Amino acid sequence: MNSVILSRACRVVLGLGILLVAACAAPPKSAQAVHPVETTTVESALYDQYQAWQGTAYRYGGMSKAGVDCSGFVYLTYRDQLGMQLPRTTLHQSRIGQAVSPQQLQAGDLVFFLTGPNTRHVGIALDKHRFVHASKSKGVVVSSLANDYWQQTLWQARRVY
């Protein structure tokens, strides 16, 4: 009889141990899974976001209409318009999704630029030729990827949806 009680107690302890280990497991990384989203829906959502934020001043670390930085604008756009949680910083955003060539850009793809020795910039492609971003000098704007500056500093593009 004591062995039955001991066996039952061991199973309970083992079960609790398994539950504890499972509860401590790290959650999956956000926006790592790439799944199709209709491009016209994404494009429409991006234009809605641009209309709402157009001209908002650039502010490093900013996350509001009082001022927003480039990765903050990307973070807020994906969260509010596309229902996706992306990392907050440009560096971490540059590590998610799948790499795409500039010729394959679609609305919603992230475009990354190396604008200085240790400086990165991110925006969101509207199509193969334009992107929306928080510019240090102009705030939230649409810029052309054909512009010499952006062509020379283009680092990579990634698809995260």
Model-assigned labels for residue ranges:
Residues 1-24:
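Sec-dependent bacterial lipoprotein signal peptides
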Residues 36, 85-147:
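...with weaker cross-activation on analogous glycine-rich loops/strands in unrelated enzymes
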Residues 150-161:
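Glycine- and charge-enriched low-complexity intrinsically disordered segments
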Residues 47-51, 57-58:
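Recognition helices and adjacent regulatory flanks at domain boundaries
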Residues 56-107:
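Catalytic cysteine-centered active-site loop
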Residues 18-42:
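Bacterial Sec signal peptide processing site at the extreme N-terminus
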Residues 42, 46-49, 69-70, 74:
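Stable alpha-helical elements in mature extracytoplasmic
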